Amino acid sequence: MDHLKHLQQLQNIERIVLSGIVLANHKIEEVHSVLEPSDFYYPPNGLFFEIALKLHEEDCPIDENFIRQKMPKDKQIKEEDLVAIFAASPIDNIEAYVEEIKNASIKRKLFGLANTIREQALESAQKSSDILGAVEREVYALLNGSTIEGFRNIKEVLESAMDLITENQRKGSLEVTGIPTGFVQLDNYTSGFNKGSLVIIGARPSMGKTSLMMNMVLSALNDDRGVAVFSLEMSAEQLALRALSDLTSINMHDLESGRLDDDQWENLAKCFDHLSQKKLFFYDKSYVRIEQIRLQLRKLKSQHKELGIAFIDYLQLMSGSKATKERHEQIAEISRELKTLARELEIPIIALVQLNRSLENRDDKRPILSDIKDSGGIEQDADIVLFLYRGYIYQMRAEDNKIDKLKKEGKIEEAQELYLKVNEERRIHKQNGSIEEAEIIVAKNRNGATGTVYTRFNAPFTRYEDMPIDSHLEEGQETKVDYDIVTT
């Protein structure tokens, strides 16, 4: 009985909204920004709204005479329904009534979707992943159509912009506007990672992309912020070990082997307790489609409103929605979807990418934008593109290549002498925990300058560190070989 009463009330609400349109024709635009004819529960009311929309398109008055003339012959509205609409008492403020109609429409669609899910779930021929993908798209469509919001006028936008300026002034000129990257000089370029941004971090293998990402993850955890990490290459446990190595300054080799003294165990326990309290979430499936990323992030955001940033390692390991597409089309789709998702959830998304092997053939092996694999879409969608470059990696490879060349030329003694010299240097530098220089190249910055940030890389702890301004090596000077630990 209560349900029947609710439906009768809804029918009356629909009539009041339609009567309001007849009284003030201009209101149809406001109503149509939220409602479609299919949103009306009572079919004659939906047909009335459809006719009113056609009259508005033709610049005709929306009144009783024109409504009756415009009614299609095969879809007649009963006289009592027309009389009920024209006799309804209109109100000036119909926004609340429009919202009520929309809410009821969404609930009906959800009920229908639930039945569809049940039917599809009982069909053994369909894959569960396909059903989930279809459901996610339907729910997202409902979410997108459930709000009364549309265009925003300039006054509202300017007020919002002024609020941002005032807030930044309150924080102070040295504060970043987004989430700190963990590197002061990089923040000076980017103002941190800002809401809605897609940030790309690219490098060749062995440059330490994952290490840099984990440094940024630990920095982002401050201020009780939630952080999501999609690791498609390494397990969550491996990333957790890197985080512990960074925080405890216990090198990875000792940490993995468990050869720790009492002080190190105590330090490890403290860091374990500290990190356990953080809102850090890992998703480490090795195969993932863009739909799964979207679904998991939306779910996490709904459960943890404090989610502030997401990291993906790395983009080319993801698949597009359709495997039949060319790979560059899939990558373009993925980058576009990530950018859209960043804006929707109002968080920055940081995606790591692998760079083309062709850059290895250049004398200057510092990456440029065209080095991104299948790069067209990525370069276009990204707000910021960062490249990682460590000169010592290439110096080591050059030395190894020189040793191989000497062997091939039959200069065995010379090759052996160089081999012993190089290995001794690497052993000493590894033992002493020497630090090498690394460059973070800001290759694209939609809202700021481009340039190079010089950092230190501490390989035993897989940690990047800020470097004082102007303390980097002179241009053209070779980076000193430090150790033979190579990270991914």
Swiss-Prot record:
Example GO biological process term?
A: DNA replication, synthesis of primer
Residues of the region (HPI) are: 390-433
SUPFAM superfamilies in the record, alphabetically?
A: N-terminal domain of DnaB helicase, P-loop containing nucleoside triphosphate hydrolases
Question: Which UniProt keywords are present, listed alphabetically?
Answer: ATP-binding, DNA replication, DNA-binding, Helicase, Hydrolase, Isomerase, Magnesium, Nucleotide-binding, Primosome
Q: Quote the annotated effect of Q8A.
A: Forms predominantly hexamers
Pfam families given for it?
A: DnaB, DnaB_C
Provide the family line: Belongs to the helicase family. DnaB subfamily.
Q: How does it assemble?
A: Homohexamer. Dodecamer formed by 2 stacked hexameric rings. Binds ssDNA as a dodecamer in the presence of ATP, in the presence of non-hyrolyzable AMPPMP binds ssDNA as a hexamer. Binds DnaG primase; when the C-terminus of DnaG (residues 415-559) binds the dodecamer dissociates into a hexamer, which can bind up to 3 DnaG fragments.
Q: What is this protein identified as?
A: Replicative DNA helicase DnaB
What is the organism of origin for this protein? Helicobacter pylori (strain ATCC 700392 / 26695) (Campylobacter pylori)
